Amino acid sequence: MEDYRTIRGTAIGEYEEKKSRFIAQLSFADSEEKAVAFLEQVRAANRTARHNVYAYRLREGSRERYSDDGEPAKTAGTPALEVLQHSGLTDLIVVITRYFGGMLLGTGGLVRAYTTATSRALEAAEVVTVRSVVALDVTVDYGLYERADLLIRAAGGKLAEPEFIDKVILRWQMPEHTEGPLLTQLQELTRGTANVTVSEPFYAAF
């Protein structure tokens, strides 16, 4: 499973020209169902807008879709999709809402507006790398907690809050196939008593 880049959550970018407002809303979406749901959400919130143009890219089936939503062909959805393509990001959708200002922009003006609004939303987004990771946990005595914590951090593990009961349970995530040396260190630290569980790999921002 290969790493890929996407965004975390949502982001907004705006552009205005000749009193027309272009509001680009960007969202993480790792399936067509999620992309369509976000599109419908934006449409419902902007029913009085003249256009709700969209473009999305999904890893699932290497899908790319766009719609000019009534704008002249290739002046709206196409430039928005091209911005997403050039970013190298995937599993995301952008919906650009246009509130018409009463003046026509022409083909060049529309392409510029939809390109700029989408680019500004991308600039505002938090870009993350999604990797194949595993979730691990280990139970250690209180006396070994700090040293185990240091080992995990030094190995690049992303730690969750520990659980303090009669012993300490440490939980963390790390990229798949990198956990081997750390597991050896934990066994050495606990003299072979560490009971470490390792999950099946899954994708997560890391």
Functional labels for PLM-detected ranges:
Residues K158-E163, T190-F206:
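Conserved short beta-strand edge segments in small beta-sheet-based binding/regulatory domains
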Residues E126-Y142, W172:
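Short glycine-/aliphatic-rich beta-strand segments at the starts of folded cytosolic domains
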Residues A148-A154, P181-T190:
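Short amphipathic alpha-helices in soluble, non-transmembrane regions
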Residues W172-P181:
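Terminal, non-globular segments
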Residues Q25, V53-Y54, D91-V94, A135-D137, ...:
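Structural motif
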Residues M1-T75, T197-F206:
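C-terminal regulatory domains involved in ligand/effector binding and gene-expression control
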Residues T139-G157:
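Short amphipathic alpha-helix segments
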Residues A76-A125:
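Active-site beta-strand/loop microenvironment that shapes enzyme catalytic pockets
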